[in-house]
Curated annotation (Swiss-Prot):
Gene Ontology molecular function: glutamate-5-semialdehyde dehydrogenase activity; NADP binding
InterPro entries: Ald_DH/histidinol_DH (IPR016161), Ald_DH_C (IPR016163), Ald_DH_N (IPR016162), Aldehyde_DH_dom (IPR015590), G-glutamylP_reductase_CS (IPR020593), Glu-5-SA_DH (IPR012134), GPR_dom (IPR000965)
UniProt keywords, alphabetically: Amino-acid biosynthesis, Cytoplasm, NADP, Oxidoreductase, Proline biosynthesis
Name of this chain's protein: Gamma-glutamyl phosphate reductase
Family to which this protein belongs: Belongs to the gamma-glutamyl phosphate reductase family.
Primary location recorded for the protein, binned into one broad class: cytoplasm
Organism: Bacillus mycoides (strain KBAB4)
Amino acid sequence: MNEVVAKGKKAKEIARELVLKSTNQKNEALAAIADQMIVETAYILEENKRDIEEGKAKGFSDSLLDRLMLNEQRIIDMAEGIKQLIELRDPVGECVSAWERPNGLSIQEMRVPLGVVGMIYEARPNVTVDAATICLKTGNAVILRGSSSAINSNKAIVSVIHRALKQTSLPPESVQLIEDTTRDSAKQLFTLNEYLDVLIPRGGKQLIDTVVREASVPVLETGAGNCHIFIDETADKQMAFNIIINAKTQRPSVCNAIETIVLHEKWAQQFGSELFSSLKERGVELRGDSKSLAIDSSIALASEEDWETEFLSLTLAVKVVSTTEEAIHHINTYGSMHSEAIITENEENVSKFFTSVDAAALYHNASTRFTDGSEFGFGAEIGISTQKLHVRGPMGLPALTSTKYVIRGNGQIRR
């Protein structure tokens, strides 16, 4: 029996145990993990340093190295995140709805764990902690499969989690890591229907598309973030500048950063040159259409591929349009249904944008950087779903549950 199958089988067994654990037992386990993370910070950083050094030797980009890098503050933040997770209401066992039928049957819809959750993800070691702890909070066993670039960090974090769980009533095997980072192990996970209840990919478009295309297990798609901001002709100049700069430069390597700005031509003719200069001063490389180049000839001409690309870096595409309808068409054509924004003082255009643009999160006069579980008040998230079934947008704790119906009677039979 190979590693993936063996760990899948074990996870299925563990899931039957976890469903019996109380909220207090789960929270005690989370507290132990948070404490152990702090105690073993030096060990985690030592292993993370190995990944960083190997990444530099392989020529990883600065944005990829940033996603891969851990430091003392990031580990403290992860531990604090776990403590905040403890304070969140446990959705398991919640009565979603209840009613009584004329025949006397009492029916309740109850929240239950999904069972075994698979996570396949790239680069970010913090996902190892997020996925493990959110799954434990919701009573799910989890199988983690990170990328080869973060294997040392992930192995260290999971070993720390195991040492913490040994001090609690939750089995250490509640969290398992697939240490084989070859393509074969990923493909096995895609088809682990006998043991896996859902597979959640987190990473770039290529990874997500591969999982969606090849997996036979149910998939919760956390789509890539090819996000846009549309500046219409009535947009306040300073507001538009502030939002665009924040959405692009605050942390360009994350999925809710923008990759394209769409400018109404009247606004662009008045303020475009100043905006472009402001972005370039902050290290942003601009790639625009012919109308953009007419405003600033130093901008590189955008290709078709640029409109489709999640850059995850300080590269930004620029599209100039004549109408709101043209902007919406461009966004719906190239967007990844993640987060899209409009900056405008025209309520009619807001309504049109909100009705017509197909995305998980739509913003009026605000940065797309707020698409995040903590910013939405969920307190924690397993990812941001861009699909429409089961859940959409930031996936908080209820997203890792299903429901079952509990029916109580006193001898009723169907006639």
